[in-house]
Amino acid sequence: MSDSKNLNQERQKALDNAISQIEKAFGRGAIMKLKQGAIEKIDSISTGSIALDTALGIGGFPKGRIVEIFGPESSGKTTLALHVIAESQKKGGNCAFIDAEHALDIMYARKLGVNTGDLIVSQPDTGEQALHIVEYLVCSGAIDVIVVDSVAALTPRAEIEGDMGDQHMGLQARLLSHALRKLTSIVSKANCVLIFINQIRMKIGVVYGNPETTTGGNALKFYSSVRLDIRKVSAIKDKDLIIGNQTKVKVVKNKVAPPFKQVDFDIMYNEGISKVGEIIDMGVKLNIIEKAGAYYSYNGIRLGQGKENAKSYLKTNYTTADEIEQKIRNMLASDSDVTCFNTEGSDNLHEVEEAIF
């Protein structure tokens, strides 16, 4: 018993000595025990969607992490990223938008609530330039959200300077892999959110399984703590006029909470994510709002016939909308088992592997 105790003391002394040497070499905080001041709760920035914040498990995108948003064209990827910027700015955050596609619509960003006067915007010429700008911004320690739109537009310098028909196999994937190795640690230390918007491509010759893949190789899939698959489900019409899209978002990877949760919300043209639409959908699921046929009502108050009429009512009756929203948030906060989204187990081995890594 005495020999075992002495051995444990010697092992602990050797470990303390090793930790002391590491701290001398790399500075205090380079290594520590979890009980010595590690952050237990991960800070987050809201996505602008109550349902998506809930599905992500921590109230939004995790700070100090890399996030990937991917999906087909016109599915709402940039809209979601701009909502994150708007939410960060509301709390005094500094945000940057790396517009590699050279397609940022400033007027649309303003309609989503982005303070474009304080937004840092860059339109880089090459992928290397874009990633260097990201590195400088992150290293400043003064940035809260950086959006790169998009990975597919991060064209390597060699490809731009070469001829149109030249073959450049794997250049972009190598560029991104090298950059992410550097960015991961500094993003964590700066406690900012780095969002990459990505496009979808089709793999040739796939007979079984999902033929879709994202651009830029596999590095981003591994380094991302959260990956969101965003899709347009159907058009929202006012008579014959299309006024928005019903959108589905699936959390295909989540390192900070359980993955594979799925939410639906409306993205309205010139408005973005419809807050009142979410209030109605979640209110119905939580039995806060009553739905009888096409009629919606709350506490005996008739909100309207049809969802669009109910949305119009809540837009003009702020007190009622705020009251319902507060009840939804209180119910979600008090009961972690409340489900306002679908949880789908994945039969796709590709998706399961991404969730693990």
Swiss-Prot record:
InterPro entries named among the record's database cross-references: AAA+_ATPase (IPR003593), DNA_recomb/repair_RecA (IPR013765), DNA_recomb/repair_RecA_CS (IPR020584), P-loop_NTPase (IPR027417), RecA-like_C (IPR049261), RecA-like_N (IPR049428), RecA_ATP-bd (IPR020588), RecA_C_sf (IPR023400)
Entry binding sites for ATP: G71, P72, E73, S74, S75, G76, K77, T78
Keywords: ATP-binding, Cytoplasm, DNA damage, DNA recombination, DNA repair, DNA-binding, Nucleotide-binding, SOS response
UniProt-listed SMART domains: AAA (SM00382)
Any single biological process term in GO: DNA recombination
A GO CC term assigned to this protein in UniProt: cytosol
NCBIfam families per record: tigrfam_recA
Family: Belongs to the RecA family.
Chain's role: Can catalyze the hydrolysis of ATP in the presence of single-stranded DNA, the ATP-dependent uptake of single-stranded DNA by duplex DNA, and the ATP-dependent hybridization of homologous single-stranded DNAs. It interacts with LexA causing its activation and leading to its autocatalytic cleavage.
Name of the protein in its database record: Protein RecA
Gene: recA
